[in-house]
From Swiss-Prot:
Listed Basic and acidic residues bias regions: 502-514
Record text about domains: The transmembrane segment S4 functions as a voltage-sensor and is characterized by a series of positively charged amino acids at every third position. Channel opening and closing is effected by a conformation change that affects the position and orientation of the voltage-sensor paddle formed by S3 and S4 within the membrane. A transmembrane electric field that is positive inside would push the positively charged S4 segment outwards, thereby opening the pore, while a field that is negative inside would pull the S4 segment inwards and close the pore.
Compartments, as annotated in UniProt: Cell membrane
Membrane topology recorded in Swiss-Prot or TrEMBL: Multi-pass membrane protein
Region of interest: Disordered: 496-529
Record flagged with keyword Ribosomal protein: no
The species this protein was found in: Papio anubis
InterPro entries according to UniProt: BTB/POZ_dom (IPR000210), Ion_trans_dom (IPR005821), K_chnl_volt-dep_Kv (IPR003968), K_chnl_volt-dep_Kv5/Kv9 (IPR003971), SKP1/BTB/POZ_sf (IPR011333), T1-type_BTB (IPR003131), VG_K_chnl (IPR028325), Volt_channel_dom_sf (IPR027359)
Entry protein name: Delayed-rectifier potassium channel regulatory subunit KCNS1
UniProt keyword Transport present: yes
Length: 529
């Protein structure tokens, strides 16, 4: 905390003048400060040449009026030239009229550098403060970047430009790798909803167990089981596509259709069908449990991972509903069964989305999602570059190869060749044969290397940034003292606004008392600057 202590003085006349040098170091000019707002007494509230006693976080100093008058544009210079107590109060955080004490709640370390500035006229960068905190302190005291010493200015600007936020100035995410207070407070606000809920402590503990794999040993076991079920479901879907299973199940389906029965019950291998039922039961248990334990139902349906969980089980239940609806209508003909088979195939294809469930247990996949969310500008630029390059080189290739009958018959047909060439994939299914076509292909490949590499570098840097932030956020949630937070939640409802205000005032009085107890450690007569 910073405190400016002003000793009591005799007052001067109603109007006074203070000689202030120009900020650029020119000839001194005589500036009229202000007029005293007490016309009946005709005396000024303090002498213009009186020293200021300064207390910054327990560090007390006396600042001479001559030193402050050299820099009238700074906060202390304007305070020294203040013509009334009311004007001075607007420049400080608090003022004790009895002790003539001005109070500032600022960084004491920066104030020591500020004293050096008033002595020498040059401000040096403090390594103990980050560049943004240093800049905020300098702005508060009325110092600009021009006040920086030449030896520190280049280093300050370099550190300011090399901050983590420099790579993403348009992003709305915090620049630090550490989780910001807003992210932690969002988690705490979600947990605070359990305070007034029924069985809040138990629901909160179960919700953290299911949502945070590193929360406890049971949560790690639950995560391992969930990952195993997801992998088993994906493996069953892949095995089902093997030729031997396809031939056997196709014959059984034809026989079922001929008998007027639904082919759904015979298309699956019995072992794979039982495994599918088990996976569906587990996924349904996960979704229903998370829905019941969620602190907010509305936020539950807004979370992307929860939507993925719902989509993973939705095809199975839609297939059952389609079968029941067809059975209620009495449709046993081949046309209805054929439509049902197409619907079932579409629903089966949706099972591939189950692989996205792994994102709940993978920091890398969640970081990838956050990267794509905050990289839409870079992705748009990448697609724009590709579209321009494909259009240009496809037209050139069509002009050079249209007479050769090698697949470049139309410009839209050349788009496929241009896309695989610019992305340096090069399937080789369509290749130019003329010299002009080969030159166009070479330019297309080189242009793809240069154009695609530029946005990809930015996207990769963002992925690394979000990955570190996600790891830090998980560590912060995992290492938080949950028991203390639960005790806090249990007492929130009993605290009224009046008691909160009383606690706030008591805390401020305690802080002032702590500062007063530190005062004797300072010399009784601070050094004059």
């Amino acid at each position: 905390m910073l405190m400016l202590l002003v000793r009591g003085t005799h007052y001067e006349s109603l109007r006074s003048k203070v000689v202030l040098p120009t900020p650029l170091g020119g000839r001194s000019t005589e500036a009229l400060v202000s007029e005293c707002p007490i016309p009946d007494t005709g005396i000024r509230w303090r002498q213009s040449d009186e020293a200021l006693r300064v207390n910054v976080g327990g560090v007390r100093r006396l600042l001479s009026a001559r030193a402050l008058a050299r820099f009238p544009g700074t906060r202390l210079g304007r305070l020294q030239a203040a013509a009334s107590e009311e004007q001075a109060r607007r420049l400080c955080d608090d003022y004790d009229a009895a002790a003539h004490e001005f109070y500032f709640d600022r960084h004491p370390g920066f104030f020591l550098g500020l004293l050096h500035f008033y002595r020498t006229g040059h401000l040096h960068v403090l390594d103990e403060l980050c560049v943004f905190a240093f800049g905020q302190e300098a702005d508060y005291w009325g110092l600009g970047e021009n006040a920086l010493a030449a030896c520190c200015r280049a280093r300050y600007l370099e550190r300011r430009l090399t901050q983590p936020r420099a790579w993403d100035e348009d992003s709305d995410t915090p620049s630090s790798v550490d989780p910001c207070p807003d992210e932690i407070s969002d988690v705490q606000r979600e947990l605070a909803r359990y305070g007034a809920a029924r069985c809040g402590r138990l629901r909160r503990r179960l919700w953290l167990t299911m949502e945070n794999p590193g929360y406890s040993l049971p949560s790690k076991l639950f995560s391992c089981v969930s990952i195993s079920v997801v992998l088993a479901s994906i493996a069953a879907m892949c095995i089902h596509s093997l030729p031997e299973y396809q031939a056997r199940e196709a014959a059984a389906a034809v026989a079922a259709v001929a008998a007027g029965r639904s082919p759904e019950g015979v298309r699956d291998d019995p072992v794979l069908r039982r495994l599918e039922y088990f996976c569906i039961a587990w996924f349904s248990f996960e979704v229903s449990s998370r829905l019941l334990l969620a602190p907010s139902t509305r936020n539950f349906f807004c979370h992307p991972l929860n939507l993925i969980d719902i989509v993973s089980v939705l095809p199975f239940y839609l297939t059952l509903l389609a079968g029941v609806a067809l059975g209620d209508q009495g449709g046993t003909g081949g046309k209805e069964l054929g439509h049902l088979g197409k619907v079932v195939q579409v629903f089966r294809l949706m099972r591939i989305f189950r692989v996205l469930k792994l994102a709940r247990h993978s920091t890398g996949l969640r970081s990838l999602g956050a990267t794509l969310k905050h990289s839409y500008r870079e992705v748009g630029i990448l697609l724009l570059y590709l579209a321009v390059g494909v259009s240009v080189f496809s037209g050139v290739a069509y002009t050079a190869e249209k007479e050769e009958d090698v697949g470049f018959n139309t410009i839209p047909a050349c788009w496929w060749w241009g896309t695989v060439s610019m992305t340096t994939v090069g399937y080789g299914d369509v290749v130019p044969v003329t010299v002009a076509g080969k030159l166009a292909a070479s330019g297309c490949i080189l242009g793809g290397i240069l154009v695609v590499a530029l946005p990809i570098t930015i996207i990769f840097n963002k992925f690394s940034h979000f990955y570190r932030r996600q790891k830090a956020l998980e560590a912060a949630v995992r290492n938080s003292n949950h028991q203390e937070f639960e005790d806090l939640l249990s007492s929130v409802d009993a605290v009224s606004e009046a008691s909160l205000e009383t606690s706030r005032e008591t805390s401020q009085e305690g802080r002032s008392a702590d500062l007063e107890t530190q005062a004797p450690s300072e010399p009784p007569h601070p050094q004059m600057y």
